[in-house]
């Protein structure tokens, strides 16, 4: 899912999503903890929650 999300970012933002956002904020990239730092980090948080619900996990 992370590679697909990176591809989406690349197409919409015209940035390499993997390189630019892999270590951005608290939720962009692998893992996630704490409070999202800004709107971009919140987007990654929402993506993680959505993906978690689809796969049966429920991140808070």
Swiss-Prot record:
Function: Snake venom phospholipase A2 (PLA2) that displays mild but significant inhibition of mouse platelet aggregation induced by ADP and collagen. In vivo, induces edema in the foot pads and gastrocnemius muscles of mice but shows no myonecrotic or myotoxic activity. PA2 catalyzes the calcium-dependent hydrolysis of the 2-acyl groups in 3-sn-phosphoglycerides.
Organism (species): Lachesis muta rhombeata
Localization of this protein: Secreted
Protein name (record): Phospholipase A2
EC number: 3.1.1.4
InterPro entries with a match to the protein in the record: PLipase_A2, PLipase_A2_dom, PLipase_A2_dom_sf, PLipase_A2_His_AS
Disulfide-bonded cysteines: 28-44
Alphabetical GO biological process terms: arachidonate secretion; killing of cells of another organism; lipid catabolic process; negative regulation of T cell proliferation; phospholipid metabolic process; venom-mediated edema in another organism; venom-mediated platelet aggregation
GO cellular component: extracellular region
Necessary cofactors: Ca(2+)
Alphabetized PROSITE patterns for the sequence: PA2_HIS (PS00118)
Pfam family, one: Phospholip_A2_1
